[in-house]
């Protein structure tokens, strides 16, 4: 069953720059999809159209059977409760502790006052610690986030996302700021979350080798258009060159 559908989506910035052109695809529940393409190809714009950080100029985005491209602010807030977001630069509150940042994943489910006062239930706190334990961070729970390494910060971002209990997790270049060893840890965690928790994942990646190893499906973008949509084992060197105008060897980042 399709969890997400793009139907003829276009996005034009400032009435001149076409970021997306007639994008059409669907994502079923449980898929692990990697979107690849050079900088400026439209990868981030696709994710932003899903969670309505930007509005599509034309076309329709359906998420969980609801048209979110034309939704009210209230309906957008409801949709965002089901969509976790993991950012390249973590988007954490550095002065707060790890556990506080993870609990922020529940803010969308609380009133403004409860959120501001940090009113979390004991079951929510217990769940946050369980998630941190699975991600190997429980010993860091009371550390400020600005004391963590980049890989640890990204795991906090993953934990916060899981805390939302999302149907979909969007990852915008989640390993771009990490060394190869930390990148592998992050990708392994995301893969395990997808398999074991049955959460659909869509990742924007520059690293072709990472997409080939982890994704069940790859979407290739060039100049705002889809030029490949299929399984990793059908992605040929010629198609990679078409996507990037570069050879496969130049796009390898050893994270095995």
Regions from the language model: what does each represent?
Residues 36-38:
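The feature captures the beta-strand-to-loop junction immediately N-terminal to the Walker
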Residues 51:
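Helix-to-loop junction immediately C-terminal to a conserved catalytic motif
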Residues 67, 114-139:
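Conserved ABC ATPase "signature" region
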Residues 144-148, 152:
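Conserved ABC ATPase signature
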Residues 165:
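Conserved catalytic motifs of ABC-family nucleotide-binding domains
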Residues 169-172:
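Catalytic Walker B motif of ABC-type/P-loop ATPase nucleotide-binding domains
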Residues 180-182:
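Helix N-cap at the start of a conserved alpha-helix in ABC-type nucleotide-binding domains
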């Amino acid at each position: 069953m399709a969890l997400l559908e793009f139907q003829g989506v276009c996005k034009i910035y400032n009435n001149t720059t076409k970021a997306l052109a007639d994008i059409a695809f669907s994502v079923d529940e449980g898929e692990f999809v990697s979107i690849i393409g050079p900088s400026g190809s439209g990868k981030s714009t696709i994710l932003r159209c899903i969670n309505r950080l930007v509005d599509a100029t034309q076309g329709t985005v359906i998420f969980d059977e609801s048209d979110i491209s034309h939704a009210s602010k209230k309906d957008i807030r409801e949709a965002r409760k089901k969509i976790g977001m993991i950012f390249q630069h973590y988007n954490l509150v550095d002065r707060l502790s790890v556990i506080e940042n993870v609990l922020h994943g529940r803010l969308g489910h609380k009133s403004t006052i409860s959120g501001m006062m940090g009113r979390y239930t004991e079951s929510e706190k217990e769940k946050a610690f369980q998630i941190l334990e699975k991600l190997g961070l429980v010993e860091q729970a009371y550390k400020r986030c600005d004391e963590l390494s980049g890989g640890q910060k990204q795991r906090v971002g993953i934990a916060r996302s899981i805390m939302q209990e999302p149907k979909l997790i969007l990852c915008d270049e989640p390993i771009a700021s990490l060394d190869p060893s930390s990148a592998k840890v992050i990708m392994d965690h995301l893969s395990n979350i997808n398999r074991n928790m049955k959460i659909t994942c869509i990742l924007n990646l520059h690293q072709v080798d990472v997409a080939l190893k982890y994704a069940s499906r790859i979407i290739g973008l060039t100049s705002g258009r889809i030029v490949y949509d299929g399984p990793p084992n059908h992605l040929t060197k010629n198609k990679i060159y078409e996507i990037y105008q570069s050879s496969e060897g130049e796009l390898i980042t050893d994270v095995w």
